[in-house]
Curated annotation (Swiss-Prot):
Subcellular location: Cytoplasm
Annotated protein name in UniProt: Regulatory protein RecX
Pfam families on file: RecX_HTH1, RecX_HTH3
Coiled coil region boundaries: none
Function recorded in the entry: Modulates RecA activity.
Amino acid sequence: MAKLQVSLKARALRYLSAREHSRQELARKLARYAQEGDDIEALLDTLEAANFMSEARFSESLVNRRAARFGNSRILSELKSHNIDPDSLTEIKAALAQDEVARAREVWTRKFGVAASDANGRAKQMRFLLQRGFSHRAIQAAMRAKEENED
C-alpha cells in the first residue's frame, strides 16, 4: 500500500501546530520534502499573510521557552541565528534586561543552592552561569544577593 503524499502546506501547518517556527527554520524543514516546481517562499508568504506564521510570535515563544534556563546573550544569539529583525531584537533585549539578575539567581539556586566556600567553587559557579549566557554584571549581582541572604 502506497503512502499518501502530504502536501507542503499540510506539512507546514503540522509543524506550526506543534510550536512556532521562524521563516528560515520552516523553509529548511520543508525543503527536504519539496519537489521540483514547489515554491516554498510563496507558501511561506501565504502562511504569513494568513497569520499562521509570525516572527513576533516565534520570538515571544522562544524567549518564553529559554528565559527560565538561559541568559540574555544566549537567547539573543539564538534569535539572531533565526534571522529575526534587528529592531525586534532591540525590543527583546530591553525586555530581557529587566529581569536578568532574578533569572540568574533562580538558575544558580536550582543548580547550587548555597554559595561556594572557596574561590575555586565560586569560579565554577560563575563559569556555569556564563555558559548559560548571563552577563558578568547579572552573575555578580545574583551571587552577591545570595551571599547577603545567607549571612
